[in-house]
């Protein structure tokens, strides 16, 4: 809701209140999600911002907070219990379910016990990837009920195929609530459908409410309208499919949409490399299998973090960077983003398992320090800083400090919203996707479709056409012709090139706390000079030598390709 409202420039705070109002009138409580230390974002949040989060959302009409820590570190969850109670909300604390030698029934029951003792009002069994084994899940629920007869809610995704059996098992063990979905967003990477779950539980002897089919069909129709408008442009048709291949890597359904979108960019990067070296191209399916295999390799070596936001993205991104590196003749672990290092080093919480020696050795070689204290201590309060910034910019803090909260939680996105850039970029992206959809070819046509690539030959770029299958040479003339591509204007400034190691978006800073580098500024070897954001992770680009920045060759927010010149240093 935040992202869409901000990008469209809508008055999101009014939308949230209007959304919760009819639920309250019908006696239905509303939920929100809280990533504990990470709040609503992919990186840690100061304690004062976390506390304001609860105050704002309760004022907007939210009743229950579902808090989870992607590492299952109760130290990150317990503060949210207090924030919820102070705000007058119900605290539902989550157990992030995964399947490993560490994540046993006893592990989860003990975690629930700690949360209940800390004051949790409810427990959520968050089976985010749908890979929890049905019988084990039933045992977890039964074990928790022995501690205290506390409300338990089961959340799962249908993709791997365990979902319906798991729902039956947890209900037989005493689960009170089940998360369900509705067509056309149920099944696949979503929840099991309401109609199917209701029919199954009714047959099993449970007392379940009847479904108002007229209302169901109306809501289903509204969802389809949203998808036909523009929402469907961001949802891969493959998300509807069941896929038992998801059992091994354990990646959650919630990130499969972004994964498939990222995969297209990653595949393009790999095949550009292969085209320059006259190597066979890789298919998307081949890359997907390599990624799944690499996730299975990486996951235990970085301590078995439960694969839920943001750590599912971290593990997936690390695996993808390894795959891309190895496909390009490089070694594993060559590029690890700072956020991923924070997870590895313990700054985001305690990892469930042990790190592999190769990871520890790399950290020591790079002079990185491990941390075993309270993760929140690494992130001091910042609300006063944002209050001052809003005052300087003459921005209203909003009703119940809503605007202040959004700025402190999402500084870059908020500034893009205020400038109008977010809306402009969003509408341009929707237009582009609609055009691509309108021009989409059939599968048979796509198989024989030609691709135009830019190939570098002895420093000179040439546009060439790569054809698949039997293609009439006459059709290639316009596209290829051995005419050099028009070279980009040479960037101002002298010195050595700082090249982008991957495709993504260029940023000088990743948050408002950092000061952007400028032309003329001196830098030392190892200094962070900019970032390339890819796959929801900011990858720090460091100076490889001492010197002075003579040129910055991209603007913040620009899309850059691998080997694009980002800066020049002399």
Protein language model annotation of sequence segments:
Residues 11, 258, 262, 281, ...:
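Active-site loops and adjacent core secondary-structure elements that bind or stabilize anionic groups
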Residues 489-570:
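Structured functional modules or segments
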Residues 314-321, 326-519, 525:
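Flexible, low-complexity "carrier/transfer arms" centered on conserved reactive residues
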Residues 1-8, 12:
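Single conserved hydrophobic/aromatic residue that forms the stacking wall/gate
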Residues 127, 173-190:
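Glycine-rich phosphate-binding active-site loops on the catalytic face of alpha/beta enzymes
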Residues 165, 190, 198-201, 205-280:
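Core active-site phosphate/anionic-ligand binding loop and the adjoining beta-turn-alpha structural block
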Residues 67, 123, 174, 197, ...:
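Conserved, mostly hydrophobic/aromatic
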Residues 17-26, 42-162:
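Hydrophobic, small-residue-rich alpha-helical packing segments that form membrane-like cores
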């Amino acid at each position: 809701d935040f992202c869409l409202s901000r990008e469209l420039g809508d008055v999101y705070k009014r939308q949230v209140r209007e959304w919760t109002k009819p639920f309250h009138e019908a006696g239905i409580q509303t939920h929100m999600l809280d990533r504990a230390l990470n709040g609503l974002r992919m990186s840690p949040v100061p304690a004062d911002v976390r506390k304001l989060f609860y105050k704002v959302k309760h004022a907007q009409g939210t009743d229950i907070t579902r808090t989870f820590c992607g590492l299952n570190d109760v130290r990150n969850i317990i503060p949210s219990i207090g924030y919820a109670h102070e705000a007058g909300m119900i605290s539902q604390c989550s157990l992030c379910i995964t399947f490993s030698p560490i994540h046993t029934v006893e592990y989860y029951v003990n975690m629930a016990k700690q949360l209940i003792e800390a004051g949790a009002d409810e427990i959520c069994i968050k089976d985010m990837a749908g890979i929890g084994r049905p019988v084990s899940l039933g045992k977890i629920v039964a074990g928790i009920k022995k501690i205290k007869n506390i409300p338990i809610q089961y959340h799962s995704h249908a993709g791997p195929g365990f979902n319906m059996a798991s729902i039956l098992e947890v209900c037989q063990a005493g689960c009170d609530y089940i998360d369900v979905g509705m067509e056309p967003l149920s099944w696949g990477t979503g929840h099991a459908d309401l109609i199917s779950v209701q029919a199954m539980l009714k047959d099993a002897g449970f007392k379940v409410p009847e479904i108002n089919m007229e209302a169901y069909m109306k809501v289903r129709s509204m969802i389809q309208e949203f998808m036909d408008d523009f929402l469907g442009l961001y949802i891969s048709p493959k998300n509807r499919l069941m896929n038992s291949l998801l059992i091994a890597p354990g990646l959650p359904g919630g990130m499969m949409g972004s994964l498939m979108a990222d995969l297209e960019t990653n595949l393009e990067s790999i095949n550009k490399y292969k085209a320059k070296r006259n190597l066979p191209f890789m298919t998307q399916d081949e890359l997907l299998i390599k990624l799944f295999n690499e996730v299975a390799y990486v996951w235990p070596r970085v301590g078995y973090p439960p694969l839920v936001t943001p750590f599912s993205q971290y593990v997936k991104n690390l695996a993808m960077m390894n795959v891309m590196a190895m496909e390009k003749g490089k070694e594993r672990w060559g590029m690890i983003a700072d956020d991923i290092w924070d997870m590895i080093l313990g700054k985001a919480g305690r990892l469930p398992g042990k790190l592999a020696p190769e990871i520890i050795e790399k950290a020591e070689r790079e002079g990185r320090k491990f941390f075993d204290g309270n993760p929140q201590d690494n992130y001091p309060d910042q609300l006063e800083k944002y209050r001052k910034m809003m005052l300087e910019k003459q921005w209203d803090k909003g009703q119940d400090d809503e605007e202040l909260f959004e700025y402190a939680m999402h500084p870059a996105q908020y500034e893009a919203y205020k400038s109008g850039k977010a809306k402009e970029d969003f509408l341009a992206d929707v237009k582009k996707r609609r055009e691509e959809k309108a021009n989409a070819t059939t599968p048979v046509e796509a198989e024989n479709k030609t691709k135009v690539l830019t190939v570098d030959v002895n420093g000179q770029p040439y546009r060439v056409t790569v054809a698949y299958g039997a293609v009439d040479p006459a059709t290639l003339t316009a596209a290829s012709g051995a005419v050099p591509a028009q070279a980009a204007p040479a960037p101002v400034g002298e010195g050595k090139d700082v090249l982008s190691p991957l495709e993504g978006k260029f940023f000088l800073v990743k948050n408002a706390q950092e000061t952007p580098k400028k032309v003329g500024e001196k830098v030392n070897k190892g200094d962070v000079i900019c970032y390339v954001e890819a796959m929801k992770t900011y990858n720090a680009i460091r100076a490889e030598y001492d010197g002075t920045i003579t040129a910055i060759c991209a603007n913040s927010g620009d899309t850059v390709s691998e080997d694009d010149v980002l800066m020049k240093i002399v």
